[in-house]
UniProtKB/Swiss-Prot annotation:
InterPro entries noted in UniProt: Ribosomal_bS21, Ribosomal_bS21_CS, Ribosomal_bS21_sf
Lineage start: Bacteria, Bacillati, Bacillota, Bacilli, Bacillales
NCBIfam families, per database record: S21p
A biological-process GO annotation: translation
Organism for this UniProt entry: Geobacillus kaustophilus (strain HTA426)
Domain of life (superkingdom): Bacteria
One GO cellular component term noted in the UniProt record for this chain: ribosome
GO molecular function: structural constituent of ribosome
Family under the similarity heading: Belongs to the bacterial ribosomal protein bS21 family.
Name of the protein in question: Small ribosomal subunit protein bS21
Keywords attached to this entry: Ribonucleoprotein, Ribosomal protein
Length: 57
């Protein structure tokens, strides 16, 4: 979990920008979106295989 402490004389916008950058860097939001709905292992393998095929070509 990302934690951002607002510094002295720092605007909320700057703190929010730092928080968003930290969340993006750790991949938290992508992980949440990925786990929003259950995905069967067979579907997960199929997607992984298709992604590898796309990278190759």
């Amino acid at each position: 979990m990302s934690k951002t402490i607002v510094r002295k004389n720092e605007s909320i916008d700057d703190a929010l920008r730092r928080f968003k950058r930290a969340v993006s860097k750790t991949g938290t939001l992508q992980e949440v979106r990925k786990r929003e709905f259950y995905e069967k292992p067979s579907v997960r393998r199929k997607k992984k295989s298709e992604a590898a095929r796309k990278r190759k070509h």
